[in-house]
């Protein structure tokens, strides 16, 4: 079975669009882009367009690659204090001279729709309500729920320990809630006995950032595999590259119980959860 993200994202987004159409005012999403990284330009354009399509007011705020931390903090402060803005997203990665943590911490937790502010991360770890969850982990759990894949008591192996995916996803999966409550093993590319552990997992989340890292020899035939990675690999086509995930899809798909494709799996879910967080922020500010 293929775990395609498009129908799941469509269900989430249609609900948001309907609710926005019944609202007297529109939520606002500000997307901050520093520099001119081509991939980041594509992602920013996609997020702004999706928000606009849903009926939100969305704008990209662009700063040059030599922008100082002071420049960025001034912009964020202005957006924090703008009552028409309900969500602020700073596109990562940032130019190397900038402190990403300082930028993220400058965003008001109430407008941190990426869910990366330490306060929102802390609420997530403590199991407290009211914060925003990071979009990709939230999207993964939504994807699994849509396909009626149970998590309660299951062994989930998360390969990757980033602050954006691996760590928050592990915390979300372990929450004492009937819809999660999984037994989680958090791994990385240098973990000892990696294959031995993965073969015991009911669900494998690959978020290690290494193309084709998870091979069919590393999983069991009953495994459900979610591929978070996206990498460009040289190919003999018009683009000169092809997109692949962290999973060796062509071989894994023949062995596992279910797998998410790249592209078309987790990607649409990340954007959908960003829109959901922005809408939730708007509703909180209006209540």
Swiss-Prot record:
Enzyme Commission designation? 1.5.1.5, 3.5.4.9
Listed under catalytic activity are: (6R)-5,10-methylene-5,6,7,8-tetrahydrofolate + NADP(+) = (6R)-5,10-methenyltetrahydrofolate + NADPH; (6R)-5,10-methenyltetrahydrofolate + H2O = (6R)-10-formyltetrahydrofolate + H(+)
Superkingdom of the source species: Bacteria
Query: Could you name the Gene Ontology cellular component terms for this entry?
Result: cytosol
InterPro entries referenced in this protein's UniProt entry, alphabetically: Aminoacid_DH-like_N_sf (IPR046346), NAD(P)-bd_dom_sf (IPR036291), THF_DH/CycHdrlase (IPR000672), THF_DH/CycHdrlase_cat_dom (IPR020630), THF_DH/CycHdrlase_CS (IPR020867), THF_DH/CycHdrlase_NAD-bd_dom (IPR020631)
Query: What is the name listed in the Swiss-Prot or TrEMBL entry for this protein?
Result: Bifunctional protein FolD
One GO molecular-function annotation for this sequence? methylenetetrahydrofolate dehydrogenase (NADP+) activity
Q: What does this protein do?
A: Catalyzes the oxidation of 5,10-methylenetetrahydrofolate to 5,10-methenyltetrahydrofolate and then the hydrolysis of 5,10-methenyltetrahydrofolate to 10-formyltetrahydrofolate.
Pathway in which the depicted protein is active: One-carbon metabolism; tetrahydrofolate interconversion
What are the disulfide bonds? none
Q: Which Pfam families match?
A: THF_DHG_CYH, THF_DHG_CYH_C
Q: How does it assemble?
A: Homodimer.
Is Lipoprotein there in the keyword field?
Answer: no
Q: GO biological process annotations for this chain's record?
A: L-histidine biosynthetic process; methionine biosynthetic process; purine nucleotide biosynthetic process; tetrahydrofolate interconversion
Listed binding positions for NADP(+) are: 160-162, 189, 230
**Family note:** Belongs to the tetrahydrofolate dehydrogenase/cyclohydrolase family.
Q: Which UniProt keywords apply?
A: Amino-acid biosynthesis, Histidine biosynthesis, Hydrolase, Methionine biosynthesis, Multifunctional enzyme, NADP, One-carbon metabolism, Oxidoreductase, Purine biosynthesis
User: What species is this protein from?
Assistant: Chlamydia caviae (strain ATCC VR-813 / DSM 19441 / 03DC25 / GPIC)
């Amino acid at each position: 079975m293929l775990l395609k993200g498009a129908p799941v994202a469509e269900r989430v987004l249609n609900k948001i669009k309907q609710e926005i159409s019944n609202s007297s005012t529109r939520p606002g999403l500000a997307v901050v882009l520093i520099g001119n990284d081509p991939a980041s330009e594509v992602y920013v354009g996609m997020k702004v367009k999706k928000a606009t399509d849903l009926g939100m007011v969305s704008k990209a705020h662009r700063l040059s690659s030599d922008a100082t931390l002071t420049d960025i903090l001034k912009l964020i402060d202005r957006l924090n204090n703008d009552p028409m803005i309900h969500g602020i997203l700073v596109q990562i990665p940032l130019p190397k001279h900038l402190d990403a943590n300082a930028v993220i911490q400058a965003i008001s937790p109430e407008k941190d729709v990426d869910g990366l502010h330490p306060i929102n991360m802390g609420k997530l770890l403590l199991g407290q309500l009211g914060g925003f969850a990071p979009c990709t982990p939230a999207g993964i759990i939504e994807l699994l729920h849509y396909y009626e894949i149970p998590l309660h008591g299951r062994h989930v192996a998360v390969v990757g320990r980033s602050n954006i995916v691996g760590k928050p996803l592990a915390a979300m999966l372990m929450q004492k809630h009937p819809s999660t409550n999984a037994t989680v093993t958090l791994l990385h590319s240098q973990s000892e006995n990696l294959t031995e552990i993965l073969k015991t997992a009911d669900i494998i989340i690959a978020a290690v950032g290494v193309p084709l890292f998870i091979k069919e020899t590393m999983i069991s035939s009953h495994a459900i595999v979610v591929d978070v990675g996206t990498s460009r690999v040289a190919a003999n086509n018009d683009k000169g590259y092809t997109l692949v995930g962290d999973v060796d899809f062509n071989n894994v798909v023949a062995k596992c119980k279910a797998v998410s494709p790249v592209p078309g799996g987790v990607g649409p879910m990340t954007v959908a959860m960003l829109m959901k967080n922005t809408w939730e922020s708007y509703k909180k500010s209006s209540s």
